[in-house]
């Protein structure tokens, strides 16, 4: 009888540990602080690295804020790229509490250039898939140019591909 109880207790412990390992893969449904880092590119030759930090409500909803660094190489009138700093609010909703989950997200904020007066408003809705701790998304990005070097072009429209890691 003692062997049976010891074996049962050992199996219950192992199953509990296995269940904990499996649920750690579902980062979108864990309540508390969450962060991510992402690399992205757009069709207009912008290359970015961003990080977002915020709160996950435990039901698939994440709200946070982020900052990044962007190199913009499409402006033909100069040989050197422009370096920009995006600052944004970030909202994301993951639909499933599974290892693979589709999501929708939106980033709204500003893009700031310290070299020139070329500050822009940023709107970036995105759809994608989270696979465990990794995320891949495809989105539309609108950058409205307030004032600066790009004359006769009030806004820029991009398709942005993003690959990220969720902590």
Where are these regions (language model features)?
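Short glycine/proline- and aromatic-enriched beta-strand/turn motifs that initiate or cap beta-hairpins
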Residues: 19-57
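Predominantly the C-terminal beta-signal and adjacent terminal strand-loop region
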Residues: 22-24, 70, 120-167
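Transmembrane beta-strands of outer-membrane beta-barrel pores
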Residues: 39-43, 67-73, 95, 108-114, ...
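Solvent-exposed loop/turn segments connecting transmembrane beta-strands
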Residues: 38-48, 74-84, 111-120, 148-156
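Repeated loop/turn-to-beta-strand initiation elements of outer-membrane beta-barrel proteins
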Residues: 60-63, 98-102, 131-138
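Transmembrane beta-barrel domains of outer membrane proteins
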Residues: 40, 52-54, 92-94, 126-130, ...
